[in-house]
A protein has these predicted regions:
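Conserved, well-structured beta-alpha core segment at the onset of a catalytic domain
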Residues: 1-89, 245-276
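Glycine-rich/acidic phosphate-handling loop/turn and adjacent ATP-lid/helix
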Residues: 86-231
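Conserved glycine-/histidine-rich ATP-lid loop and adjacent helix of the Bergerat-fold HATPase_c
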Residues: 229-251
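Residue-level detector of functional hotspots within protein domains
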Residues: 14-16, 48, 156-160, 237
Length: 276
């Protein structure tokens, strides 16, 4: 974590947590959501909420939304790594050399139009399944539920090494002012253009249901396909905003660049203090 040119590691953050809670700006660089990382974030964010005097229900929805946004960022980075691998396999087919395929891959990954076009050649369910496998294996390690097989260890090690190789991080910035508590979550992978459009459409439909007094209906089975393809995690965050009387379309913004995706979440201090 960096703040005013001070960098602290996890154990140091916990030791200094009472002083840190009084600061107005934080910048954390995350590799994943390990239990120690979750504990640090819980202590820090809930400490800030206590300092603000936030309603416990509002605090619950805020922290749940933040964890969901960070999990989305982690999944996006993993998905990007797996997409790269699958695309490289496609490019190596035929008489293309490994070196030529890798050079072409870099050109594609740096060009949004080419990168988006290549999605049609990669089976989405295959990528999704591998992402879920990575998350499942990480969870088994975290909870010590199961000893991984050799093939599982190799697969997970390969993904981890590529995340390190391509320096795929998650940046979390927290800022507190008199008016609002805001978060900026940035991961090192762009959103596919069509996925971005579907997310926006999905959020609008969710808002329409909320306006009708039925926002929870968005999570019924008839919306299953939309949840899977258009940002179920974002829908969960939006629902948290609705639950505390706030409009997420005004307070949660998603932007995507050539190499990154950024989520901005803003919570008015007055809204966090309200009784529900």
């Amino acid at each position: 974590m960096a703040n005013q040119k001070t960098a602290l590691k996890g154990s140091e953050i916990l030791k200094n947590i009472e002083d840190l809670k009084k600061r107005k700006f934080f910048h954390l660089e995350l590799k994943g959501l390990t239990k120690p990382t979750r504990d640090i974030l819980s202590e820090l964010v809930n400490g800030i909420l206590d300092e603000i005097g936030a309603n416990p229900l509002a605090g619950f929805h805020l922290f749940s939304g933040l964890m969901e946004a960070l999990l989305n960022a982690i999944k996006a980075n993993i998905r990007h790594i797996i997409f790269r691998d699958e695309l490289l396999k496609k490019l190596e087919q035929g008489e293309t050399s490994r070196q030529d395929a890798e050079e072409l891959l870099e050109i594609i990954m740096e060009t949004s139009l080419l990168r988006d076009a290549m999605h049609r050649y990669i089976v989405p369910d295959k990528v999704k399944k591998q992402v879920q496998t990575v998350l499942s294996l990480e969870d088994k390690i975290r909870t010590k539920k199961k000893v991984l097989t050799e093939s599982e260890k190799v697969f997970l090690s390969d993904v981890r090494s590529k995340i390190e190789k391509y320096n795929m991080n998650i940046s979390l910035k927290i800022r507190i002012t008199k008016e609002e508590l805001s978060f900026r979550i940035r991961n090192d992978s762009p959103i596919h253009h069509l996925d971005f459009e579907r997310i926006q459409e999905s959020r609008q439909k969710h808002k329409e249901l909320f306006d009708q007094g039925n926002s929870a209906d968005f999570f019924r089975p008839e919306f299953l396909n939309e949840k899977e393809s258009a940002g179920f995690g974002i829908a969960m965050i939006d629902e948290g905003f609705y639950s505390i009387g706030l409009n997420p379309l005004d307070l949660l913004t998603i932007t995507s660049g050539a190499r990154t995706t950024t989520v901005y979440m803003k919570y008015p201090i007055s809204g966090l203090k309200m009784d529900f």
